Design a protein with these regions (language model features):
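Catalytic core regions of nucleotide second-messenger enzymes
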Residues: 61, 90-108
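Conserved long alpha-helical elements within nucleotide-processing catalytic cores of c-di-GMP signaling
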Residues: 2-16, 23-50, 60-64, 68-72, ...
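HATPase_c (GHKL) ATP-binding subdomain of two-component histidine kinases
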Residues: 69, 106-108, 112
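Catalytic-core segments of nucleotide cyclases and related cyclic-nucleotide turnover enzymes
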Residues: 72, 76-84, 101, 115-155
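Conserved beta-strand cores of small sensory beta-sandwich domains that regulate signal transduction
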Residues: 16-18, 60, 111-113, 147
Length: 155
């Protein structure tokens, strides 16, 4: 559970939250229909699970077309690598997306944030909020990219 992982951050281990959002998913559903939208969600979810395989890491659907990935005991470099691997893996699925004004295929935007071992005031809400803010920046900067809010994770 994410709360258990956050407690681990308080005990001297880093914790990262990676928010993943499918770009222009409403347009995908509008163009292809909800059954294809559901299939797209399932394919993206599998790509996330395949990209994140370390013990203790979690992948979950957060709502709508958003997913959350919790990386336990990861360095900043490992978080960045995992997020970029997720982005590239989804793009490599090459799922056609006629409703995407930029890429013509399904892509994701990713925001990441870290709870540092020394952050005694970390909370699940704050960590998710920071990752969501980073996701917003990724979308504002053109989508299909990773945006880190902090670079202070340490194992």
């Amino acid at each position: 559970c994410i709360r258990d992982r956050l407690n681990s951050a308080r005990e001297g281990h880093s914790l990262a939250c990676v928010m993943v959002d499918i770009d222009h998913f409403k347009q995908y559903n509008d163009h292809y229909g909800h059954p294809e939208g559901d299939a797209c969600l399932a394919s993206v979810a599998k790509a996330l699970r395949d990209s994140v395989r370390r013990p203790g890491d979690l992948v979950a659907r957060y709502g709508g077309e958003e997913f959350i990935v919790v990386l336990y005991r990861a360095t900043e470099a490992q978080v960045q690598q995992a997020a970029e691997r997720i982005r590239a893996t989804v793009e490599a699925l090459a799922i056609p997306h006629a409703g995407s004004p930029l890429y013509g295929r399904v892509t994701v935007s990713i925001g990441q944030a870290c709870a540092r071992p020394q952050d005694r005031h970390a909370s699940v809400h704050r960590l998710i909020q920071q990752a969501d803010e980073a996701l917003y920046q990724a979308k504002n900067r053109g989508r299909n990219r990773v945006w880190p809010l902090t670079v202070e994770c340490m194992a």
